[in-house]
Amino acid sequence: MLDSPKLTARQQQILDLIQTAIARTGAPPTRAEIAAELGFKSANAAEEHLQALARKGVIELVSGTSRGIRLRGETVRNINAARGAQFNLPIPGLSQLTLPLVGRVAAGSPILAQEHVDQTYTVEGSLFAHKPDYLLKVRGMSMRDAGIMDGDLLAVQATREARNGQIIVARLGDDVTVKRLRRTGSAIELLPENPDYPVIRVEPGEPFEIEGLAVGLIRNTMLM
């Protein structure tokens, strides 16, 4: 095992927060969320600690998105092992999954219908917080600030249930979309992670189903 970088207590706290957020919601926290959780006066304080973690090779920061934080799997795994901590993190080489890649989904037909499957990919199962059932090719930039870009492959666990704040694949009428779920009483909203896109409000009686839960992301460049 390679030596782990030495982290300050605050850096370790932030790393644990990032891992917990990814395991719980499928996405890393924003700088503002880190600041609020840890009592910082501003998001800039969180940014300084994130930059320090990046310099130590623990995370990678992706510019242009508020949730652009990627864990460096091997380094983080070594840190956790040294502390006896357990998080569901990438552990390369332990397992492989063959997943169908779903392209465009025709209105009214199941997502995993054969005609929607463009091809299959074999990927590390340990890349994901929970076992996915398929990959969905992302189209558009409505989830940019969650680090989900046009052309990325979203790992999806098929389920009809999701908690507030989780990123879901939803069928609304004839359309399939990736958004963050927000329920307020009986009201349902599908939130983009890009201010250029509107909030989608599900009207009473409008056909709506949760098709799956985002459990990971693969950059399309990783598979080229």
UniProtKB/Swiss-Prot annotation:
Belongs to the peptidase S24 family. Signal peptide: none annotated. Residues 31-51 bind DNA. Keywords: Autocatalytic cleavage, DNA damage, DNA repair, DNA replication, DNA-binding, Hydrolase, Repressor, SOS response, Transcription, Transcription regulation. Gene3D superfamilies: Umud Fragment, subunit A, Winged helix-like DNA-binding domain superfamily/Winged helix DNA-binding domain. Disulfide bonds: none annotated. The active site is at S142 (for autocatalytic cleavage activity), K179 (for autocatalytic cleavage activity). InterPro entries: LexA, LexA-like, LexA/Signal_pep-like_sf, LexA_DNA-bd_dom, LexA_repressor, Peptidase_S24_LexA, Peptidase_S24_S26A/B/C, WH-like_DNA-bd_sf. The record marks A107, G108 as: Cleavage. It comes from the Bacteria. Its EC number is 3.4.21.88. GO terms for biological process: DNA repair; DNA replication; negative regulation of DNA-templated transcription; proteolysis; SOS response. This is LexA repressor. The keyword Membrane does not apply. Homodimer. The gene is lexA. Represses a number of genes involved in the response to DNA damage (SOS response), including recA and lexA. In the presence of single-stranded DNA, RecA interacts with LexA causing an autocatalytic cleavage which disrupts the DNA-binding part of LexA, leading to derepression of the SOS regulon and eventually DNA repair. One of its GO terms (molecular function) is DNA binding. It catalyses: Hydrolysis of Ala-|-Gly bond in repressor LexA. It is an enzyme of class 3 (hydrolase).
